[in-house]
Amino acid sequence: MDEVKKYGKTLEEIEGELMFGKISFMLFLFHCIFSDDFPESLADSDEEHNIFDDEFDAANDETFGGGLDNIGENAEQVNCLVRAYHSLFFQTARLRLDDPVWHHPSSSDQVAPDASAIPFPTFGNGDSSDTFKSSFEAESPFLKKSIWGNGADSSFNIWGSDFGIAAVPPSSSFDLDYNSIAPNEAQQVSPLVQQKPSSQIPSMPSSALTVTCLLYHEFLNLISFKLEDFERMQLGDSTDTLTAALNDLQLGSTNAQSKIEQAPTTLQSAPGEPLKAQTLPKLPVSALSLEELEQKIIRESQTVNVANTQQTPQGSNRFAHPPPGFTANMKNAQHPAMGPPMGMPGMQMPPPPMGYQQMGAIMQELPRLPPLNPQYLPLVPIWLGAIVNNMQLPMGVPPIPPFLYQLLNHYRNPSLVHAMIVHSSIPPNSRPNGPQFSGPQVGPHSPGARGQQRRNSGMPSTRTIYDLALDSFAGYMSFKEREWLIRIQFVQCKGSGDPCIDDYYYVRWRESQIANGWTAHPKPESKQPLPASSESRKDYLERIRRMNYREMQKERLRDREKERQRERQERIDRGEERKPRQTLTDKFATSLGLPSKSSTHNPRHVLDMKAQVDSVDNQAKKLSDEERKNAVQKKLRTMLLRLEGALVLLMEAEELRRTSSSDKSQFKDLTSEEKEQEVEKRTSLIIDEFMGDDLPKLMQMSKGRAVLTRTLKVVGPRDQARIILSLMIAAGLVSKKMYGEIVLDILPVVHQKVSNLHPDQFKYLVGALNLDNIKRQLMDSNMFVRDVMLTLYLVSVKNNQNLLEWSKQTKFSSLKMPSSAPLGFWRKALSAVTDAEITEFAEDIKYSGVVDCHEVAKLIEQSL
């Protein structure tokens, strides 16, 4: 501890060394810029390079400084020095004077005020009825208390004292006093005051700037120099711009020119002389010690409430660098009541935007910006302060939008940028209506009085529906309630690791359930994903349409059945109304008696000898039923007669096909060509007669199937293909109960005739198939169509055709049916084919690559 005290320094020594080092470096920097002896360590290492040797796209003397010598080298030197000073500034700006040798936190005995007692800068015009203030400042946690802060006020900290995050300074600490930065015409440099040397450091006035603000102001003025300023200073065309800029900084009674002159003499000290032997520069009269600064802060915090109630004087012009188009008449266009916000010196927020009445004339000449989300408007001052101070954003603040950098780079005025954003983002409905007031209004009918009178005795506040709409809790929760709710949510999310603490009631309930015999159900096994279907979208749409068609047919059948029941009930009702009540003896009118046991409740009936006469309705019903039966019988007889006629024609055609006709034949004198013409005439008549709507009926009749098979044997290959195609189309209208008989009667002849076709004729037959109709009938489990297609596959194998290529050419997908009906009838119908050929056919199907080939091959093997 003694060693620490030995090398320790007092607060006054450290503050003096820090101030002397920064000011000396600035004076040395200015001396090096305007003198010829530039330090070689800071010079550019590339001495041979000259920027005038580079090629430019334009030859603009005004832009590139034509006619000047060594301007490029001076610019490079300035940039190098600016970067060096910029790095030094930010390295020393955050120095904390909390050396462990100090045993007292401050040099004053008075207790510093609490963080919550320090006033926060006000927004708007300072009026309680201001629209901007009531809409945004009252509801934004960034303009009032914040749950993210670490202050020691009445509100608690949700993060706790042991969270491990360093304390974050409030948002007001990231802001700068822009009124003190901007050069003002009203600010005058005080003349030099000759004072006697004193051993004590004089106190600084309350209007003096701190060391950090002073250095930052000097840095801003340094980097704001342009190339033309250096030109004037080199050539001597105008007054010293640097001296004028330093005079605008209000450095007390110290003259900037005298500092520049004293800089070389001050820096010329012996190399071996220690730093403490150097004489410290005299502080100006306006300097302020740390004790006086703390007392000033305490006084301002105690009198802030009184100062807010008083009318503030008219502030100076807030636009230090107005954009083009501003006139001098606009300088005093602000509201008289608007003044600089009360707060800590050096930590002020950007000045509040002007009211809508005073801002209209100025904003008419500024470009209209895109509107900003109203929830982000309270963050604009924080963003601007972070950009100007080059500081990090507080915790929980969103990142800075890029357009703020562009606006500040263009206008060079944070207050103007803030006013433009507010003017562009406030909705028109939130702006005050009615006449515009140019000055303060006093009286019961003034806008302020109306805002105060708007609150009724029973209403909680003066906020409007627009204010509640911007509130995330719709105005139903206070700040304390929100803070408490968020804290509970954070605690719940964090968890303690103990189930009894995190979810006590559920743990107790689960224990009671287990005690009662409850056991956890095993998790259901995950269903295996279904294999990807090879069905195309066209097939899928066709299947859906077919399903819808079947549902429509079923619906029609249900409607038809309901209609029959309704008609039947109507006939029964009509008959019951006219028919008298009869006894059981009516049923046995022609019998000798009723065969029933006699009892007291049912004595033996006497025979009723009256003639039984049917009613007119019953007679009509009987007649209608008989007529229906007669009509059906008549149609059946007509069909049989037509079949008999077709059989006669087929017998004649078969007789004409014979090579040797008998002597009794009526066609014995005809030539072969004439016989062929007669055969074609008769077969065409049969095909035109039966290959229409009556074909499904013909397929369900044994005589009809006989006519079809005999016709296939007589006609030529072209007509055979027509008949086969017609049979496959009409099979969808045949009852499924008849599929077995149809396959056994027709399929053998179909196989025989298809096998005898020429490969070109077979190709024509396959190309003429209606694949959509075939797929639809296969989905309906039409066994006849399935067996016919399987027969075509068998014939194609016999013709040495590749099934896969043949399936691709015909665009046919699969022979698998949903019902997977066996191939027993197909094997019986093809009894002429041996089992060896069927087995070979099954192997060809299995390794053909056709869709569902393995399932079809398995069915073929099962048919053996």
Curated annotation (Swiss-Prot):
It comes from the Eukaryota. The keyword ATP-binding does not apply. GO terms for molecular function: RNA binding. One of its GO terms (cellular component) is P-body. Its main location: cytoplasm. The keyword Cytoplasm applies. This is Protein PAT1 homolog 1. The gene is patr-1.
